[in-house]
Amino acid sequence: MKQAGYRCMGATMRLYQNEDLGQSGFHTCCSAKDVEDAAEVAFQLDIPFEVVNYTEDFREKVIEKFIATYEAGGTPNPCIDCNRTMKFDKMLDFARAHGLDHVVTGHYARIEQDPETGRWLLKKALYTDKDQSYVLYALTQDQLAHTKFPLGGMDKPSIRKIAEEQGFCNARKHDSQDICFVPDGDYVGFMERYTGKYYPDGDFVDLDGRVVGRHRGAVRYTCGQRKGLGLAMGAPVYVCGKDMEKNTVTVGPESALFTTTLVAGDFNWISIPALTGPMHIKAKARYRQTEQPATVRPLDNGLVQVVFDEPQRAITRGQAVVLYDGDVVVGGGTIL
């Protein structure tokens, strides 16, 4: 961006203190090491740099929602909430407060304006192996108009080569894979430390409601899970559902995981202002899934029904369903 003639400023968000979350032994995203790396790159580029403290907002809008979704029986995607409420909301406010027009990040996606409708479009990255459009579906028209993704048309090896040629300290830094505030993957342990709660054992039940074993707390299990159940039932069984009030986890054969229909709420439309009737598009209900043909229909109260042409495995409450028309994101919402 600096080479293109823009007036640039570097900024990184402090979203939590590792020690506060019991993660002092990990180098997570937004860690002290990340702040140091960002500051060094800004110094090399000869641009101003600030660390912005959003710890309280992050706790309220991301961490506490993450916990509430698990406690309600869903499986959250906190990266989507962080993008929606932190990176492209708080940081845009920060940019404007400093007289700057855009937030620029390293996400793999593209933004273009539709010359016919004037709407800002979110599109898949050209380097599809790294495409992140799924976790960016919640961006508003205002946010898209003031955001740039310069890496959206590039591939990862080329980007690393440029970073090495510039001598950036983070040129060979590993990609982040885990939830930033739960880097060890033990989200239940994190939740218990954070809330002071203990999530009690309960019953595994089959599809007919018969008790078939004991589980270690319903929050530990997600739809479609097979590993770690500790059940010997003569055939493989999978998590098919949870009743959080009764603290039961329903298990059954893999065939019970397949369904064609879901309902989603909290929808954000991007390429269209609203859904006014049935539309045949492609949709995916998890990050690593390939989009599948489906029909979407508007329901009352802003809800949306998605009916896939073919049954899909383990559609999970709390995850996002994102709709595509080719490489353009039509919109997305949270599975109910």
Q: Where does each model-flagged region fall?
A:
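AMP-forming adenylation/ATP pyrophosphatase catalytic core
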Residues: 104-111, 115-336
